Amino acid sequence: MLSIFEEYLPFSGKNVNKQDIKDFMETLVKARLALDICFVRPTEYGYALDMNLNEDNDILKKLQMLQSMLYVSSSNYTNYRWFNWLMDVVDASKGIPDAQRLYSYMKEKADEVFPLPSYDTLTYQGDNRYWFWRLDFYIWLHRNEIFDKDSPEMDIVENYIFKRNRSIEHIAPQTPQSNSMMQWDNTETDKTLRDSFGNLVMISQGLNSALSNESYEVKTAHVQSYCNGAKSGSIESLKLLMVHKEYSKGWNKDAIKEHGEKMYDWLKASFEDK
């Protein structure tokens, strides 16, 4: 380690540049500030973010959810891609930045780095997990417009936690059981619809294994058991919650198209949020 410092930042001999050393130490202080106060931290119960603000602060919660979304959509090796966004604001603020300023800048950078792909590319075959997380963030952000204040659904959304261990799965299964009201024709049109954004959610592999190839009716009962408190835990996908909120009576090909178009419109609208 010392040899690396000696090569790139000499601290002894004739090549010492005191200004470079000072700049480096100041950068370390800023990085420590960003990590300790401005960077979301996973906890046993979700995530924590300091910013020297009360945990009930609305903008702090919004910033925490945005960073949580970015955290799960990156790996331990790619967090640096958006850590630099924090450093930019810390540097410009010459200390702890205003939470709203940090949120606005990070949201702007996310919009820039992740442009919305076409609807047709958001398929089962693609690596599109970011867009399911982003949609969940949009639903959480607009929860007061979407859900009734005292509804079980609102309680679920208020306590939603982003998690990494998620995979994209079908709502109406690829090979439905015989008692399912939803059946696929052996056509390219049905195959495309089956694998389209409207018929997909992102859930844990454990839940997917438990409900593998189960009918929509069985999955609806599963979601309802969370809403009425019969099962502990919570819904793993707010997109899935929207499906069962709006299509409690059944899931068919028209519903898949309608839901997919609406959710894609919400993704487009997410770029207008500031």
Q: What positions do the PLM features span?
A:
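Flexible coil/loop and intrinsically disordered segments
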Residues: 1-274
